[in-house]
Amino acid sequence: MLNRIIYDPFNDGLDTEQHFEKIHIKTKQRTKTKSITIIENIPEKIDLKLFLKKLKYTFHCSGSIQQNYDDDSKFIQLSGDHRELVKNFLIKNSIVKESNIVMHGY
């Protein structure tokens, strides 16, 4: 079994010397009353499975990790409109700074 080190953003805190790409948080309308929240450009050193698990537990929603086939990147998809909650969650847990978050759909 491989012993891999996983970056846990909930324990490590924000490292001020690291440069992250801007995280994009947007929503897409599925039907007239239902929507999904998409979180893109999550830093590669964050374990997406653990991050998704924390988001689903915190917001009481379903979610999944999706593959973007245009550039082979991964993003998180949550059911419902959770843009503000995700933004506050990222800032509160010191995962990224507020200046590195881009909100779409306002």
UniProtKB/Swiss-Prot annotation:
SUPFAM superfamilies, from UniProt? eIF1-like
* PANTHER family per the UniProt record, alphabetical: EUKARYOTIC TRANSLATION INITIATION FACTOR SUI1
Q: Which UniProt keywords apply?
A: Initiation factor, Protein biosynthesis, Translation regulation
A Gene Ontology biological process term:
regulation of translation
Pfam families, per database record: SUI1
Protein purpose: Additional factor that functions in concert with eIF-2 and the initiator tRNA in directing the ribosome to the proper start site of translation.
Protein name (database record): Protein translation factor SUI1 homolog
Q: Which domain of life is it from?
A: Viruses
**InterPro entries per record:** SUI1 (IPR001950), SUI1_dom_sf (IPR036877), SUI1_euk (IPR005874)
PROSITE patterns, alphabetized: SUI1
